[in-house]
């Protein structure tokens, strides 16, 4: 990995499970769309995460450009798939973190940060030296390597991770990742081992731990049941080792209609998923209301804060 003053830029990138080998040091982009220069699309207080993340003051959220998944229904597709964002320096990212802290954020929330891990770690080092003291959230689609999870040790306090699928066929069709579950399962286990059981401050704001999300998809609740089976197995083995969050907010963005999911989930479908979660002993987490499936909950990627 050739080094700049602050960052070791991959010359054969293996940061995500695709291990595409892109020479990012030479400015080439990988499968994720990321090259040699850090890129972000929004940095602002965000109020629509789980209550223990957003609290009353908001989560200091930075949306990074690019993504290691290619979800056909992605609500953030302008930044994840179409490259929207502004190139920034590591030093500027550190100042963004400090600005969000000064605005009263409960935490720093890194959205799809995996493809920029070395850059973000360098920025966190700078920001910490200048007084950053907030918990750091890794907001990830779950498609990670165990090695990348380990590389975040000492930097990430809270994992806000998806478990999207169990079915290889479904993850191939909807996210171009037939190995999604094979990669996500050990990665999530590494997250739980690293973070430990959830811990909260006096205001009920999460300080460390794992929130494990699942977004129920229309027409695919059988795979939701399989996901919940895996969540239940983890919870049975170590009760309270994570906070489950079952979401109904699916909205058919981007290319969803081309893949047979061009509608919202029905109340009947979501009730079946929630009831299954309850039956599996996952009642200690969050269950979204159907009213959350609204486009206005999607942030505007207008380069605010970057």
Regions found by a protein language model. Give the residues of each.
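Auxiliary Fe-S-binding modules of radical SAM enzymes
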Residues: 1-29, 197-306
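N-terminal [4Fe-4S]-dependent radical SAM core
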Residues: 1-68, 72, 76-81, 301-303
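Short Fe-S-cluster ligation motifs
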Residues: 40-61, 95-113, 285-287
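Glycine-rich active-site/cofactor-binding loop and its immediate structural neighborhood
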Residues: 65, 69-103
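Residue-level detector of family-conserved "landmark" positions at structurally sensitive sites
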Residues: 81-84, 110, 137, 285-288
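Flexible, glycine- and charge-enriched loops at secondary-structure boundaries
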Residues: 86-90, 177, 181, 263-267
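Positions that flank functional sites
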Residues: 89, 115-116, 292-293
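Conserved AdoMet/S-adenosylmethionine-binding subsite of the radical SAM
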Residues: 95-259
């Amino acid at each position: 990995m050739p080094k700049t003053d602050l960052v070791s830029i991959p010359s054969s990138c293996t940061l995500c499970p695709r291990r595409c080998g892109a020479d990012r040091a030479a400015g080439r982009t990988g499968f994720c769309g990321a090259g040699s220069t850090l890129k972000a699309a929004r940095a602002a207080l965000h109020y629509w995460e789980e209550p223990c993340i957003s609290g009353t003051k908001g989560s200091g959220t930075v949306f990074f450009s690019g993504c290691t998944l290619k979800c056909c229904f992605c609500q953030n597709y302008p930044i994840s798939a179409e490259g929207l964002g502004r190139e920034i320096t590591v030093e500027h990212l550190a100042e963004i973190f400090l600005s969000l802290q000064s605005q009263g954020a409960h935490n720093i929330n890194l959205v799809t940060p995996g493809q920029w891990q070395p850059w973000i770690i360098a920025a966190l080092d700078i920001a910490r030296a200048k007084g950053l003291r907030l918990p750091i959230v890794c907001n990830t689609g779950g498609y990670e390597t165990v090695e990348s999870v380990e590389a975040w040790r000492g930097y990430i306090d809270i994992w806000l991770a998806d478990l999207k699928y169990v079915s290889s066929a479904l993850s191939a069709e909807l996210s171009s990742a037939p190995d999604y579950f094979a990669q996500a399962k050990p990665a999530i286990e590494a997250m739980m081992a690293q973070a430990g059981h959830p811990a909260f401050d006096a205001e009920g704001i999460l300080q460390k731990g794992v929130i494990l999300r699942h977004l129920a998809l229309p027409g695919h609740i059988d795979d939701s049941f399989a996901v919940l089976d895996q969540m239940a197995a983890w919870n049975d083995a170590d009760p309270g080792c994570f906070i489950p969050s079952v979401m109904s907010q699916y909205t058919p963005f981007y290319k969803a209609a081309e893949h047979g999911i061009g509608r919202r989930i029905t109340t009947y479908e979501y009730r079946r998923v929630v009831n299954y979660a309850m039956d599996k002993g996952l009642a200690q987490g969050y269950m979204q209301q159907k009213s959350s499936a609204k486009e206005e909950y999607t942030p505007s990627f207008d380069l605010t804060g970057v």
